[in-house]
Amino acid sequence: MNFTGSRPGGADGLRVIGTGDFSELLRLSGTHSVAAENFRAPSVHAPAQTEATTVLSFHYKDGVLIAGDRRATAGNIIMYDRADKVIDLDQDTIIAIAGSPAVAFEMARTLQTSFQYYRRSQLQALSLGAKVRALGKLIKDNLPMTMQGIGAVVPILAARDHTHQPEPSLYFYDALGAQFNAVDFAVSGSGSPAARSVLQWINRWSGNPTMQRDEKAAVQLALQLLDVAAESDSATGGVDRRSHVFPQVKVLTRDGLKSLDVETIRECFTALEAAQK
C-alpha cells in the first residue's frame, strides 16, 4: 500500500495522510467483508439465526435517550438475557442494534475503527453527516444477507457534532440503508409496534410529550416502554424482576455521552413500582 500522499488540511495545520476513508484502506490492503457478495445460504434447513430486539430512542428535555432490552433469541430459544445492544461508537455517537447481533457487532466495530482512523489520519473528527451515511452504506452492503432472510440489521443512531451541531440528532434506517432524521422518536425490533403506539399517544395526546421530560422521567418512560413491549413480544426481555436484569440506557446531550449504571436504572424502576402501590 502507498500511504505517501500527505497533504495539508488538519485542524491544527499539520499534514494529513491519505483520504481518511477506512473502507478504502481495507480495499487497498485486500481485506474483504466476511459476508462475501457471492454468498448463498441454503434454501432449506438453515439454522435459526440469533436475533436481538427491541431498541428505542426519543428526544427529551436535555437531549436524546437511547435504550435497549437485553434479550437475544434464536427462533423460540432464548439464547442470552444480558446482550448489550446499545453501543458507543465514539464520544459523540451511539448505535442501538435490532436484528442479527453477529452482523450488527461487526458493523459497530467497523464504524468504531473507521471513525478513529479518520480522526487520526485527518486530524479532525468525521462530520455528523458522514457518520450517518457510513452506517447506511454498511447496511446497504449487507443487502445480500438481508434478502436471504439472515443477517438483517435495522439500527438506530444517535449522534452530535460538538463543533458545528452540539444538539444531538436521532436517525433510523430501513433494510436498504436509507436514513431518516427522527423528529420525536425512533424504534426498531420485533417489540417496536407496542412501543411506537405508546410513544405516539404520549407525544400527541398525553399533554406531557417526551421533549418536556427530564432525565429521570425519560429513563422511567424507556423502562415502561420496554416492559410493555415484552408483554406482547416474547423476543423482548423488558425488565427481569426475578434476575434483576435491567435494560441498557444511555443519554446524549450537549455535554456528551453518558451511560446510566445499573443502580440508577434500578432506582428509577423501583420508584415507578412504588408509585403504582
Mark where each language-model region is.
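Long, low-complexity N-terminal extensions
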Residues: M1-K277
